[in-house]
Each structure stands twice: as structure tokens, then as C-alpha cells.
Amino acid sequence: MAFKIIEKQPQQIVSIRVVGPYHETIPKGFDQLSSLYTQYQIPGKDWLVLYWDNPETNPPAELRADVSLSVADDYVLPPELSDHLQLQVIPAGLYAVYHTRVSDDDYAKAWGELYNQHLPQSGYRPTEGACYEVYLNDGRADGYFDIDIYQSVEKDQ
């Protein structure tokens, strides 16, 4: 699939924080966010998940992710949603982007290809910034997920 390095503008999102094994908590987060999206007619565009912990080094019960929906820069979170959602900004900067298809929920394969194959060959390395997936289709309906994985990067020294 396609791999590239891009300069990205900041992106505002609304999010629900989930904690626990990713394969259990992220689908529940999508269900919650989807319900709020419909109920409150949130003017969102892209569905994404920000990852804060590495499942290879952190215990599953402590894994944190933000199930998110991109919104316009001028979007203001209504007071009735402030107990449910957090408004945040994915920072601008240099990102590696890997476009791939995930079948059989094998996200580990996609992430492994990014970190073990594409990034080492690119001349860039991951930084401590944002790391997230953007979902490009309804994988529950289609039986597979087309995704873009974004990882903040810097040039190798």
C-alpha cells in the first residue's frame, strides 16, 4: 500500500477516552461516539483513533486511546456534551502516513509494516507526538477497514 511523508496542518477533534485492551474498548468508544454524533448532530467529518500507549510495552488494562471525530476549527463543544466529549487539537507537523487495508482485525500487521518496514527505509523516525488511525470506510459493514495510519516523525540524524 502507499507510504508518504507529509506536512500536516492542525486538526480539531472531539473525542471519547477509552482505557483497556484496544480490541475491546475502541469498538465500545465508536458505539458511544456514533450515538452522540447522531443524537446531537455533531458536524463531523473523519472518524479516527488516537493512541497514547504501545501495546507491546504497556499492560492491556492500561492502554489509552481517544476515539474521535474531526470537526471544523471553529466548532464549539455544546455544554450538554462537555461531560461526554473532549475537544482537542492534533498538532501540525511532519507525519508519516501509511494507507493500508486491515482484514480480520489484524491491525498489528499494519502497524508492524509501518514501523518495521516503511519508516526504517524512509530516513525518518517516530517522535513522541501524535499517532493515530483515520478510518476511510465502514469496516463493520464492509468486512475490512481501509485506514491511514499517521505517525509524527522527524528526519534521522
From Swiss-Prot:
GO function terms (MF aspect): DNA topoisomerase type II (double strand cut, ATP-hydrolyzing) inhibitor activity
Keyword Cytoplasm: yes
Any Pfam family the entry gives: GyrI-like
Location in the cell: Cytoplasm
Main location: cytoplasm
SMART domains cross-referenced by the UniProt entry: AraC_E_bind
Assembly mode: Interacts with DNA gyrase.
HAMAP family: DNA_gyrase_inhibitor
UniProt record similarity statement: Belongs to the DNA gyrase inhibitor family.
NCBIfam families recorded: PRK10016.1 (NF007451)
Protein name in the entry: DNA gyrase inhibitor
Lineage: Bacteria, Pseudomonadati, Pseudomonadota, Gammaproteobacteria, Enterobacterales
Gene behind this protein: sbmC
